Amino acid sequence: MKKNFRFFDNRQKYLLIVTTTNEKNKIADALKPIVQKIKPKFPALKIFDAGMGDGSLLMSVMRQCHQKMPHIPLLVSTKEISMEDVRLGLEKLPDRFVEHKNTVFVISNLNYIESTSLKSNNKKKQKKMNWKVVKPVSYTHLTLPTKRIV
Protein backbone atom coordinates (compact mmCIF):
# COMPACT_ATOMS: atom_id res chain seq x y z
CA MET A 1 0.00 0.00 0.00
CA LYS A 2 1.34 3.43 -0.88
CA LYS A 3 2.27 5.99 1.73
CA ASN A 4 -0.48 8.47 2.73
CA PHE A 5 -3.20 6.21 1.28
CA ARG A 6 -6.64 7.59 1.99
CA PHE A 7 -9.34 4.91 2.02
CA PHE A 8 -12.00 7.27 0.64
CA ASP A 9 -10.02 7.70 -2.59
CA ASN A 10 -11.08 4.18 -3.57
CA ARG A 11 -14.85 3.64 -3.68
CA GLN A 12 -14.74 -0.09 -2.91
CA LYS A 13 -12.50 0.37 0.13
CA TYR A 14 -14.60 3.29 1.32
CA LEU A 15 -17.83 1.27 1.00
CA LEU A 16 -16.24 -1.65 2.84
CA ILE A 17 -15.49 0.60 5.81
CA VAL A 18 -18.78 2.52 5.95
CA THR A 19 -21.07 -0.47 5.36
CA THR A 20 -19.41 -2.80 7.86
CA THR A 21 -18.92 -0.43 10.79
CA ASN A 22 -21.22 1.61 13.01
CA GLU A 23 -19.24 4.77 12.23
CA LYS A 24 -22.27 6.71 10.95
CA ASN A 25 -24.36 5.79 14.01
CA LYS A 26 -21.56 6.92 16.32
CA ILE A 27 -21.28 10.23 14.50
CA ALA A 28 -25.07 10.71 14.63
CA ASP A 29 -25.00 10.00 18.38
CA ALA A 30 -22.21 12.55 18.82
CA LEU A 31 -24.34 15.14 17.00
CA LYS A 32 -27.38 14.71 19.29
CA PRO A 33 -26.21 17.21 21.94
CA ILE A 34 -25.49 19.75 19.20
CA VAL A 35 -28.95 19.28 17.66
CA GLN A 36 -30.51 19.73 21.11
CA LYS A 37 -28.83 23.16 21.44
CA ILE A 38 -29.90 24.45 18.01
CA LYS A 39 -32.14 27.50 18.00
CA PRO A 40 -33.48 27.81 14.45
CA LYS A 41 -34.00 31.21 12.86
CA PHE A 42 -36.99 32.11 10.72
CA PRO A 43 -38.05 30.88 8.18
CA ALA A 44 -36.50 27.39 8.64
CA LEU A 45 -33.75 25.32 10.15
CA LYS A 46 -31.08 25.21 7.48
CA ILE A 47 -28.89 22.12 7.22
CA PHE A 48 -25.97 21.83 4.81
CA ASP A 49 -24.20 18.50 4.31
CA ALA A 50 -20.97 18.93 2.35
CA GLY A 51 -20.92 15.29 1.25
CA MET A 52 -24.16 13.33 1.49
CA GLY A 53 -22.65 9.92 0.85
CA ASP A 54 -25.45 7.35 0.98
CA GLY A 55 -27.54 9.69 3.14
CA SER A 56 -27.53 7.58 6.32
CA LEU A 57 -25.98 10.20 8.56
CA LEU A 58 -28.03 13.04 7.09
CA MET A 59 -31.28 11.11 7.57
CA SER A 60 -30.35 10.47 11.22
CA VAL A 61 -29.72 14.18 11.76
CA MET A 62 -33.03 15.06 10.06
CA ARG A 63 -34.80 12.57 12.36
CA GLN A 64 -33.15 14.17 15.41
CA CYS A 65 -34.19 17.64 14.23
CA HIS A 66 -37.77 16.47 13.77
CA GLN A 67 -37.85 14.97 17.27
CA LYS A 68 -36.69 18.27 18.78
CA MET A 69 -38.53 20.66 16.43
CA PRO A 70 -41.47 18.86 14.80
CA HIS A 71 -43.13 22.07 13.57
CA ILE A 72 -40.07 23.94 12.29
CA PRO A 73 -39.59 23.72 8.50
CA LEU A 74 -36.34 22.09 7.35
CA LEU A 75 -34.29 23.41 4.44
CA VAL A 76 -31.73 20.71 3.70
CA SER A 77 -29.08 21.27 1.07
CA THR A 78 -26.40 18.75 0.25
CA LYS A 79 -23.64 18.13 -2.26
CA GLU A 80 -22.82 14.80 -3.82
CA ILE A 81 -20.94 13.82 -6.97
CA SER A 82 -21.64 10.09 -6.98
CA MET A 83 -24.87 9.21 -8.78
CA GLU A 84 -24.94 5.91 -6.89
CA ASP A 85 -24.84 7.76 -3.56
CA VAL A 86 -27.55 10.16 -4.78
CA ARG A 87 -29.73 7.15 -5.61
CA LEU A 88 -29.06 5.55 -2.22
CA GLY A 89 -29.80 8.83 -0.45
CA LEU A 90 -33.03 9.39 -2.37
CA GLU A 91 -34.20 5.91 -1.36
CA LYS A 92 -34.03 6.97 2.30
CA LEU A 93 -35.98 10.22 1.84
CA PRO A 94 -39.65 9.13 1.63
CA ASP A 95 -40.04 8.41 5.33
CA ARG A 96 -38.35 11.76 6.16
CA PHE A 97 -40.97 13.55 4.03
CA VAL A 98 -43.80 11.58 5.64
CA GLU A 99 -42.54 12.32 9.14
CA HIS A 100 -41.58 15.96 8.53
CA LYS A 101 -43.85 17.36 5.85
CA ASN A 102 -42.36 20.88 5.94
CA THR A 103 -39.10 19.84 4.30
CA VAL A 104 -37.27 21.18 1.27
CA PHE A 105 -34.42 18.91 0.15
CA VAL A 106 -31.83 19.97 -2.43
CA ILE A 107 -28.99 17.88 -3.87
CA SER A 108 -26.36 19.51 -6.06
CA ASN A 109 -23.03 18.61 -7.58
CA LEU A 110 -21.69 22.17 -7.52
CA ASN A 111 -18.25 23.00 -6.13
CA TYR A 112 -18.18 23.30 -2.33
CA ILE A 113 -17.88 27.09 -2.40
CA GLU A 114 -20.96 27.28 -4.67
CA SER A 115 -23.08 24.63 -2.99
CA THR A 116 -24.51 26.74 -0.18
CA SER A 117 -25.80 29.42 -2.55
CA LEU A 118 -26.85 26.92 -5.28
CA LYS A 119 -25.29 29.21 -7.84
CA SER A 120 -22.22 28.62 -9.98
CA ASN A 121 -19.56 31.32 -10.08
CA ASN A 122 -18.99 30.38 -13.73
CA LYS A 123 -21.61 32.22 -15.84
CA LYS A 124 -21.44 29.59 -18.60
CA LYS A 125 -22.12 26.78 -16.11
CA GLN A 126 -24.85 28.81 -14.44
CA LYS A 127 -26.72 29.17 -17.75
CA LYS A 128 -26.50 25.41 -18.32
CA MET A 129 -27.68 24.57 -14.80
CA ASN A 130 -30.28 21.84 -14.89
CA TRP A 131 -32.94 22.11 -12.16
CA LYS A 132 -35.11 19.08 -11.50
CA VAL A 133 -38.10 19.73 -9.30
CA VAL A 134 -39.75 16.56 -8.06
CA LYS A 135 -43.26 17.20 -6.82
CA PRO A 136 -44.82 14.85 -4.29
CA VAL A 137 -47.45 12.49 -5.60
CA SER A 138 -50.48 11.53 -3.57
CA TYR A 139 -52.56 8.49 -4.31
CA THR A 140 -55.04 9.04 -1.50
CA HIS A 141 -57.66 10.31 -3.94
CA LEU A 142 -57.77 6.99 -5.80
CA THR A 143 -60.35 4.37 -5.02
CA LEU A 144 -58.65 1.03 -5.18
CA PRO A 145 -60.67 -2.06 -6.10
CA THR A 146 -61.25 -4.48 -3.27
CA LYS A 147 -62.57 -8.02 -3.12
CA ARG A 148 -65.11 -7.46 -0.40
CA ILE A 149 -68.30 -9.43 -0.07
CA VAL A 150 -71.10 -7.17 1.12
Residue ranges and their predicted role:
Residues 2-39:
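Class I SAM-dependent methyltransferase Rossmann-like catalytic core
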Residues 32, 49, 72-74:
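Leucine-rich tandem repeat or coiled-coil scaffolds
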Residues 43-53:
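Conserved class I S-adenosyl-L-methionine
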Residues 54-70:
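Conserved SAM-binding loop of SAM-dependent methyltransferases across substrates and taxa
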Residues 66-126:
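Class I SAM-dependent methyltransferase SAM/SAH-binding core
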Residues 132-133:
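Extended catalytic-interface subdomain
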Residues 140-146:
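Conserved small/polar residues in nucleotide/adenosyl-binding loops
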Residues 148-150:
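Long, charge-rich C-terminal accessory regions
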